[in-house]
């Protein structure tokens, strides 16, 4: 039996990136459902999404609510996949990483990419890198977590594990 894979995307003003991101996801992931939650982008992101011809694409446009956490929850509620993934909408170039990440779910409950381990990388400006590292350090200390990059923009996990936690 082939497992269904869901990738959740949250968008706000991603008109320049969203089509490429979805194209890359479709190219690299089998049995794929894509759930996009748009926060009423004024740049036409939602209109672009409506024109994408992919039968397993679900699109939601929120008029008042905003934010990543609530977008993820809305996407999760409306998803059907055995695996649930998240990708920042402007990170389509990383879609090629998902097949290996999904394969690693045979041995792990969650798989994420980290900017802060050997082989990782962060191309943002120095202020954003420092701020991100500080947030991650404080979060790891408070949560007593060994995960190096709690704010990673790409992860995948088993649906069952996620629902057990919720």
Question: Could you say what each language-model-derived stretch is?
Answer:
Residues 38-47, 91:
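A conserved acidic beta->alpha catalytic loop
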Residues 32-40, 60-61:
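Short beta-strand/loop segment that forms part of the nucleotide-sugar
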Residues 4-6, 33:
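Cell-envelope/extracellular polymer assembly enzymes that use nucleotide-activated donors
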Residues 14-17, 41, 94:
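Donor nucleotide-sugar binding loop of glycosyltransferases
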Residues 51-54:
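Short, conserved SAM-binding/catalytic segment
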Residues 14-27:
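Short, well-formed alpha-helical segments that are part of the catalytic scaffolds
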Residues 62-78, 83, 95-166:
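Acceptor/aglycone-binding surface of glycosyltransferases and processive sugar-polymer synthases
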């Amino acid at each position: 039996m082939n497992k269904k894979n869901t990738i959740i995307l949250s968008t706000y003003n991603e008109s320049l990136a969203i089509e490429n991101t979805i194209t890359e996801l479709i190219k690299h992931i089998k049995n794929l459902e894509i759930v996009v939650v748009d926060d009423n982008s004024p740049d036409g992101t939602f209109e672009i999404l409506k024109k994408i011809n992919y039968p397993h694409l679900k699109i939601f446009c929120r008029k008042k609510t905003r934010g990543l956490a609530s977008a993820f929850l809305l996407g999760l509620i409306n998803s059907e996949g055995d695996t649930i993934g998240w990708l920042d909408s402007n990170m389509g170039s990383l879609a090629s990483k998902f097949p290996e990440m999904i394969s690693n779910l045979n041995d792990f409950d969650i798989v994420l990419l980290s900017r802060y381990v050997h082989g990782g990388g962060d191309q943002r400006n120095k202020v954003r890198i420092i701020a991100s590292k500080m947030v991650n350090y404080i979060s790891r200390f408070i949560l007593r977590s060994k995960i190096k990059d709690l704010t990673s923009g790409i992860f995948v996990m088993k649906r069952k594990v996620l629902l057990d936690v919720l």
